[in-house]
Amino acid sequence: LTISVDLVLLGIFKYGSFILSNIKFFTGFPAKVPSIMLPIGISFYTFQLITYCVDVYRGDARPQRSFKTLLLYVSLFHQCIAGPIVRYKDICAELEERRASQFDIAEGINRFTVGLAKKAIIANTCAALADTMLVPDGGDFSLLASKSVLSLWVGVLAFTLQIYIDFSAYSDMAIGMGKMIGINYTENFDYPY
């Protein structure tokens, strides 16, 4: 029931206006379609709640008695943007008994800094190169036909590296931030392709 409610709410927020405007268009119903504001991170929060419910239902984790601790799991801000995806059963004990030593904090800062450097220096440079090679001046994509095959391949490879390094960097930053507050995430970005 909880998972159904979560998915219905996600559907309403993500697709409610779209569905209502299509119904209005096809039926000619003269009602005004409300603009539904999409809460930031609704998909992330929904899937966090679903993993919690599934882990508790399967008996992989016991139900959380502290609303504050459950809220912490659902809203782990540092992994909200790009992961890593973490199951409740994998970190429930750490949520209740978090301890961050000076070594953990230093290691977390180091990992976060490496991720930030990967993003700011390598991924952003690859993005600029990909844009130069693949996005024509003025946005007229018919001009791509005039580019050499080599420049297009360089653009495609730069774009591929940008995406790979972006996600790797975001994972590094999230793992580092988790370490700083006493949460050890599993490595999940060894071989994404």
Language-model features and meaning:
Residues 1-193:
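Membrane-embedded transmembrane alpha-helical bundles that form the catalytic cores
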